[in-house]
Amino acid sequence: MTKEIIKDAEERMKKAVEVFRQELAGMRANRATPALLDKVRVEAYGSEVPVNNVATIEVPDPRTLVIKPWDRSLIKAIERAINASDLGLNPTNDGQVIRLSIPPMTEERRRELVKVVAKRTEEQRVAIRNIRRDANEQIKKLEKDKAVSEDESKRAQDEVQKLTDKYIKEVDQLMAAKEKEIMEV
C-alpha cells in the first residue's frame, strides 16, 4: 500500500520538475532558442495554436530566430502574436519568413530575470513539499487505520523525504544553471 503512495508521489514530483524545466527553457537568456516562442499563440484557422504548430523555427546564429510559416497567409498573424507577447522582440518579415533578432540583455533585465527564476524555483520547492505532505498524510491515515505498522509508516515517510530532497536538489541545480546562463554576457 505504501509503495503505491510513494510511487505516486515520485511521479508527481517528476512532473513538477519537468514543468519547471520547460518553463526555464522558455525564459529568455542571452541566446536564441526555439523554446522562447513556446508560449506564443497564433490566431490561425479559427483557433489559437502555438507558433511551432504553424511554422518551422530555426536558429541560424545565437542571436537570431527565423520563423518559416507553412502557410504564408499566417505571416501577419504570427507577427501580431509576437508583438502581443511579453518577449519584447521586434519581428521583421520579408514576405517569406519572419526574423527575430535577440538583442543583448541589459544588466538590469538580467537581474530581473534572475529574480523571476528564484521566485519560480521557490514555487516549485513548495509544490514538491506539498506533494510530500499529501503522501505523508496518506501514509499516516493507513497507520491510523491499522493498515500498516508504525515501523512501515516511518520507513515510508523516510522514503518520501528522500524523494523530496532529491527533487528539490534537482530544481536547485536547474535554477543555478539558468542563473549562470542569464548572467553570461
From Swiss-Prot:
It is found in: Cytoplasm. Pfam families: RRF. One of its GO terms (molecular function) is ribosomal large subunit binding. One of its GO terms (cellular component) is cytoplasm. The keyword Isomerase does not apply. Keywords: Cytoplasm, Protein biosynthesis. InterPro entries: Ribosome_recyc_fac, Ribosome_recyc_fac_dom, RRF_sf. GO terms for biological process: translational termination. Its main location: cytoplasm. SUPFAM superfamilies: Ribosome recycling factor, RRF. It comes from the Bacteria. Belongs to the RRF family. Responsible for the release of ribosomes from messenger RNA at the termination of protein biosynthesis. May increase the efficiency of translation by recycling ribosomes from one round of translation to another. HAMAP family: RRF. This is Ribosome-recycling factor.
